[in-house]
């Protein structure tokens, strides 16, 4: 294959470097998998006694004095090792602790989080079995920096109000533990969630504090100081992929300044990608890696376009030059958003239609927020500067409050966030990409814009027509008792079970999928507690008659059954019936349904053909003989076209043992 590729390359010189790069990348992936990953995965299925170190991503588990997160196994059954594993619950208080214990090693579950964990060097998961024995805490430098970061986080919490301290901690220290769900959702909906993830923008702004203008740009001691500051910040934040990429690019640029060489963003970015891929061949599977590099490509394209426009406007009036300057930030935001769109769609994430506007409004506010945050940390460390500390905290709070207000205003705009159909959108983007290659090869790129615009209009029109009346049903929330959300034509019906956390998960899911608040919330709980549902209509089944029926959405029917403390809702979509229940229902005649969603128990009064569930080991599993079982760990569901097809999403068939 390599020989054929080389022969083909000789005839196509322009494609030599990309093809050779792809072949080298594939070869390195195979070598990395065989040499490093395969021996680790061979440990799966064993029960071992290990010495483990708690890594810095560990956070509180559901039980008291328990953590969950990544463990680094430094010794396995008396043999030295260096294996990172995922553990859902283990004894501990903070990162850096060491202990010995017995673990059961298993492979990572085959779900959408698998590649993300592998990109962080985690190839196994473990279950804690006991025999806990604490050891002396690790003295590795990364834990000293982690403790320093925690002290600075405590300082921000002490001086800034709730919500605002979480925003500053995320932007300055890459810590999202204090971010409210509502704040994260607002930034995500407005298309500026990248501001809450430390990246090249933040690193460049912070290191720019040591720039002192163009006069001192090539002053070598100052270059070394900027490089040291960048390296310290990399280590302080724990070196996530986006920060590592930005740090490598910045260090390469500083090396260029040191030797008086011109910078090249595209080459530096490629070099960073190669380094990250060499240390872990799965690194490109990380979402942050993909978004970061795609955004850089968009920024690079915008810079090239801006230079072309400036050259064309050299002999034009001052108004044309001013127009180019005004258009540059708009083009940068638009092309960066467009470059990251395929990644967002591939990961089934919502895209923002107000991202360009919101970026223009708030990105300039990030640098003052970072500068004020640093000033607050410095002043708070000096007792006699308490007055300056109070003033800095006040100014920073007002600044962050203004930033958050702008973000929420943008997020509240109509169609701020939309969820595009994954496969169809990726196909349309692939067609547009193929057209771009064809026009570039034919040297007719100027004709590409009208052709792409026409194809986009046709794709959007066809997509809207194809999605009309399609019903999407998903399980959202706690795995043992999830809610069921039905979306059709931008309207939603929520079958509610559980508590506040389930409702929060439903709201996050509906962002971008529904144009307004849910049209109907059906409360299936046996003992409904007081909760504030934001919905056009709320129906509590416990307060209804034994049986009621009504139309919902566009041409769907809803049958509601009530018996003592058990409730059942059956949604009719054409000839198919989807059931959601709470409690063990007893009816005179059984109800036959096509799909039963995540039951807590099985009742003889409900006879499903298929059961869709999210719990790993439900109690009713042994009683499900004769039913097809469909399991999905994260938001499984199905898509129905009334009177036509039913397609399962993120749900695999499970064989009954």
Write out the residue ranges for each language-model feature.
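Hydrophobic alpha-helical transmembrane segments in multi-pass membrane proteins
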Residues: 1-24, 181-355, 422-468
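Di-metal (Zn2+ and/or Mg2+/Mn2+) metal-binding site signature of metallo-dependent hydrolases
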Residues: 192-217, 518-535, 594-606, 614-620
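Core dinuclear metal-dependent hydrolase active-site scaffold
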Residues: 277-285, 408-433, 437-442, 456-520, ...
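Hydrophobic alpha-helical transmembrane segments in integral membrane proteins
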Residues: 27-49, 444-482
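Membrane-interface amphipathic/re-entrant loop segments adjacent to transmembrane helices
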Residues: 134-135, 139-143, 150, 189, ...
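Short periplasmic/luminal acceptor-recognition loop of GT-C membrane glycosyltransferases, typified by
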Residues: 49-89, 94-113, 476-533, 567-568, ...
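Membrane-interface helix/helix-cap signal primarily in integral membrane proteins
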Residues: 29-194, 508, 555, 561, ...
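Divalent metal-coordination and catalytic microenvironments
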Residues: 52, 103, 171, 199, ...
């Amino acid at each position: 294959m390599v020989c054929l590729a080389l022969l083909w390359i000789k005839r196509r010189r322009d494609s030599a470097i990309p093809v050779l790069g792809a072949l080298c990348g594939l070869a390195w992936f195979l070598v990395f998998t065989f040499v490093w990953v395969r021996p680790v995965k061979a440990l799966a299925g064993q029960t071992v006694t290990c010495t483990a170190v708690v890594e810095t991503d560990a956070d509180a588990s559901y039980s008291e004095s328990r953590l969950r997160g990544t463990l680094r196994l430094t010794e396995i059954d008396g043999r030295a090792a260096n294996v990172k594993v995922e553990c859902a619950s283990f004894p501990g208080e903070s990162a850096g602790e060491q202990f010995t214990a017995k673990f059961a090693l298993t492979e990572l579950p085959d779900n959408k989080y698998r590649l993300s964990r592998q990109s962080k060097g985690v190839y196994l998961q473990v279950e804690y079995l006991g025999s806990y024995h604490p050891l002396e805490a690790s003295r590795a430098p990364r834990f000293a920096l982690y403790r320093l970061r925690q002290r600075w986080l405590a300082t921000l919490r002490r001086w800034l109000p709730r919500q605002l301290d979480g925003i500053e901690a995320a932007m300055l220290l890459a810590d999202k533990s204090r971010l409210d769900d509502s704040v994260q959702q607002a930034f995500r909906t407005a298309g500026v969630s990248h501001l809450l993830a430390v990246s090249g923008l933040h690193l460049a702004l912070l290191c720019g504090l040591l720039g002192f203008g163009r006069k001192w740009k090539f002053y070598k001691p100052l270059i070394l100081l900027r490089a040291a500051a960048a390296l310290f910040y990399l280590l302080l934040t724990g070196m996530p992929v986006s920060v590592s990429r930005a740090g490598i690019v910045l260090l390469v640029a500083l090396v260029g300044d040191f030797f008086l060489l011109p910078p090249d963003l595209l080459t530096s970015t490629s070099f960073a990608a190669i380094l990250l891929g060499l240390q872990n061949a799965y690194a490109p599977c990380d979402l942050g890696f993909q978004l970061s590099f795609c955004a850089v490509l968009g920024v690079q394209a915008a810079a090239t376009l801006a230079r072309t426009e400036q050259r064309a406007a050299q002999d034009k009036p001052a108004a044309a030059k001013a127009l180019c300057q005004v258009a540059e930030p708009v083009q940068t935001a638009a092309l960066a958003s467009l470059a990251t769109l395929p990644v967002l769609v591939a990961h089934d994430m919502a895209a923002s239609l107000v991202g360009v506007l919101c970026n223009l409004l708030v990105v300039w506010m990030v640098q003052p927020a970072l500068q004020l945050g640093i000033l607050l940390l410095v002043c708070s460390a000096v007792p006699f500067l308490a007055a300056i500390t109070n003033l800095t905290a006040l100014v920073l709070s007002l600044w962050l409050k203004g930033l958050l207000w702008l973000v929420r205003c943008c997020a509240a705009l109509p169609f701020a966030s939309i969820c595009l159909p994954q496969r169809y959108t990726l196909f349309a983007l692939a067609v547009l990409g193929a057209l771009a290659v064809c026009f570039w090869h034919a040297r007719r790129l100027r004709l590409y814009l009208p052709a792409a615009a026409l194809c986009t209009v046709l794709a959007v029109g066809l997509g809207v027509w194809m999605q009309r009346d399609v019903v999407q049903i998903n399980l959202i929330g706690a795995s043992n008792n999830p809610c069921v959300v039905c979306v059709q034509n931008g309207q939603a019906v929520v079958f509610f079970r559980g508590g506040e956390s389930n409702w929060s998960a439903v709201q996050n899911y509906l962002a971008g999928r529904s144009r307004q608040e849910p049209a109907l919330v059906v409360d299936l709980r046996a003992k409904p507690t007081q909760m504030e549902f934001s919905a056009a209509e709320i129906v509590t089944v416990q307060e209804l008659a034994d049986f009621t029926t009504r139309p919902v959405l566009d041409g769907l029917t809803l049958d509601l059954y009530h018996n003592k403390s058990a409730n059942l809702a059956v949604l009719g979509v054409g000839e198919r019936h989807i059931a959601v229940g709470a409690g063990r229902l007893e009816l005179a005649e059984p109800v036959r349904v096509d799909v039963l969603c995540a039951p807590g128990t099985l009742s003889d009064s409900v006879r499903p053909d298929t059961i869709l569930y999210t719990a790993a080991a439900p109690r009713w599993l042994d009683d499900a003989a004769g039913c097809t079982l469909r399991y999905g760990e994260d938001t499984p569901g199905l898509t129905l076209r009334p009177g036509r097809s039913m397609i399962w999403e993120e749900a695999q068939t499970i064989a009954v043992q």
